[in-house]
Curated annotation (Swiss-Prot):
Active site annotation, chain numbering: K13, D138
ATP-binding is among the record's keywords: yes
Family to which this protein belongs: Belongs to the GHMP kinase family. IspE subfamily.
Protein name as catalogued: 4-diphosphocytidyl-2-C-methyl-D-erythritol kinase
Pfam family, one: GHMP_kinases_C
Amino acid sequence: MIHGTTVWPSPAKLNLFLYITGRRANGYHDLQTLFQFLDHGDELTITANNSGNITLSPALADVALEDNLIYKAAMALKNAAQSPLGADIQLHKVLPMGGGIGGGSSNAATTLVALNYLWQTGLSDDQLAEIGLALGADVPVFTRGFAAFAEGVGEELSAVEPEEKWYLVVRPAVSIATKDIFTHPQLMRNTPKRDLASLLTTPYENDCEKIVRSLYPEVDKQLSWLLQYAPSRLTGTGSCVFAEFSSRKDAQAVFAQLSDNVLAFVAQGRNVSPLRKTLADYQSAKIRPY
């Protein structure tokens, strides 16, 4: 066990494009999507211990501990590795729930990667991804930590290196349940499947965007506003929308024009997750527990 207190990033992600190519008999959807991380997100402070218990603070409103993805991830790793150890986990929450930028999935992945290191359980990236997939379809991309083209239900990952652009991400004042969008009868589910080279050289789109804009006027309003300034899209099933820029200066200039009551941030895309960089820094003793 690694002693001391450690701090771990739990970064946001964007779906730079998202296409739904079919629906399976079990209700799951076949996708083609491009994930990229952001240098912005939540933060987990974790101290491993010998108690055998997992404590988490602060509690999330309306979410029981047993239903919290951080707790579920810790217990899943504990069971898979048959570890007798415990941990105290503190979450500094920045990312919105129901925003489509991976907040809960990223938290779960950070928990898996951090505790695998702190408990010295020695599970491989493949094993962590397998545990993560049982927690949520997006968790494996966060545990593996590289920008990825995903197919299947999102579990078939291929490393890619899209341009690391600057993004203005806006959070409309609504929370959207992924299930509500994927079960909507008007959702387009038959986009023709294409090879990656074709997808990367044509304008990026999101098949969920049309239905989300029709159901949530606030999303439509914010996206229409962003489109005045730059190419802009929905990420995941929303509610967050984003505009892409070639420089931080350009993104900040548009950010400065937003109303004070609009939640938004500027961040740069990252093809290697900040989580993987932090893990490497701990492993090399570039940074140490305190």
